[in-house]
Amino acid sequence: MIRNLTKLTKFTIGNRFYQSSSKGRFSGKNGNNAFKSIVGVSVGVSALFAGCVFLDQEKEPESTPSIDVKEKKSQPPKTKEDYQKKMDEEYDIEQFKYVIIGGGTAAYHAIDKILENDKEATILLISKEYEVPYQRPPLTKSLWATKDDNVVNTLNFSDWSGKKQNLLYEQESAYGNEILQFIRTKKVIDLHIDEKLVLLNDGKLIRYDKCLIATGGEPRQLKFTSTNDKKISTYRTVEDFRKLYEVVKDGGKHVTVLGGGFLGSELTCAINSNFQDKNIKIDQIFPESGVLSTLFPDYLSKYATEEIIKSGVNVHTGTLIKDVVDNSENGRLTVTLNNGKTFETDHVVVAAGIIPNTNVVKSTTLEIDPINGGYVVNPELQARTDLYVAGDVASYYDFSLGVRRRVEHHDHARATGEMAGSNMSTKDTPAPYTYQPFFWSDLTPGVGFEAVGNTSSKLKTFSVWEKPSSDETKQSYTKGNIYYLNDNNNVVGVLCYGNYGKMDTARDLILKRRTIEDLNQLQHAIDFDEHH
């Protein structure tokens, strides 16, 4: 057990990632956070489990049993505390005040809040990945623009202002001390909520006082005749970035990207814009009529697709991949489309979205949202007493929109992580999650936006462009605002296309829930002035 924890000094968290403008959306790591307070804290009296702070496990055991908390036969304990103490001793159970399952953005920001609020905290972070927590947006954006082949090792990049950043929120020196410990490359395969026990895939049991599930999602897989995982991959982690970068860095390759959503489109455009001079060719394939079709109105989806084609990408709309097979003659892959066409490629990236990872609880039933997926939580982000959920895997009720949602964007992961961490560690009444997260994307120089709320293309939309034209064929899509309305004519979502820094105004418009009697009321709801 860990004893005599070093006290942390009080700090004030900055407004990381609360900026509404894309020009501030990656301000980097705030130098004034709780992690800085624990860097340099010496490793404690007893190291984690097998005598080391960082534990690696690449292979799962052959059997992964569910949790069995039956007590060995002996003198029965008199109290629950006696029972737990006896059980912990007999089964060699390590105990932490806070256990965080998942090593992403939500987990990082939850830990930051816990360290701020609880000076007596002992925290265990469990991640299936090797890396300590890192930012995901640069994986499809800034990392590709570094022009430095050593980026796969340094993970350094420049933000919008030219400031140097690192993909990792904090370096490894912030982890592995008396206060915060980290288990890498291991999975939680079960939770026993009543006993507050976590079971790892090596059979190790860990007891918690409070636990956060922030497991994110798993990439959707597609089955092909070829099973060559060196040439067919999904794209979700920093390791995926490293592998794909190695494919394209020397040039002269052909890459095929499956998917026309955020991931597929951002990855396609990032590689294309930064490696065209190295003769990298890209085909993007998806079944919809245009990119981001679940977000953009049809006309804008088609326009964005045309812009991507103009940038040099070979885009296949309304198309599915029928199969991918190995070509034994030249070592490449042969792609067959559902329209009968075939072509050869060097690498296939499956970017078909994610499935929320709800596989960490087996012996206890947690409610899963049957429509959106993810664990159902209350307004305070609790799934059960002392068990919280944040990030992509949380299904929560959005009071502003009046619907239950599950959101897969960075700002939401940050905000729910902070809220869950705060509620887990506060001495005050836990607060409800009412924040309206925003998201952004930049595909080509002519396709970039920020958005907030429910921006489903299935909703009614009303578009206001800075330079409107009566001739649709001559319309300039440089700067505009798109409003999404529900059946009651309430604005429930706003997308600001090329019009940055307007998210606070957009949030206010959504929160008012005002019925729009005349759509022309929205003509001047959000201005086109520059706010960077």
From Swiss-Prot:
Chain spans, region FAD-dependent oxidoreductase: 98-440
Record Pfam families: AIF_C (PF14721), Pyr_redox_2 (PF07992)
Organism superkingdom: Eukaryota
UniProt-recorded Gene Ontology molecular function terms: DNA binding; FAD binding; NAD(P)H oxidase H2O2-forming activity; NADH dehydrogenase activity; oxidoreductase activity, acting on NAD(P)H; protein dimerization activity
First-tier enzyme category under EC: oxidoreductase
EC number(s) per entry: 1.6.99.-
Disordered: annotated span: 63-84
Binding sites annotated in the UniProt record for FAD: 102-106, 128-129, 136, 141, 188, 236, 392, 409-410, 440
Cofactor(s) the protein requires to work: FAD
Keyword tags: Apoptosis, Cytoplasm, FAD, Flavoprotein, Mitochondrion, NAD, Nucleus, Oxidoreductase, Transit peptide
Role noted for this protein: Probable NADH oxidoreductase that acts as a caspase-independent mitochondrial effector of apoptotic cell death.
Listed name of the protein: Apoptosis-inducing factor 1, mitochondrial
Natural source organism: Dictyostelium discoideum (Social amoeba)
Gene coding for it: aif
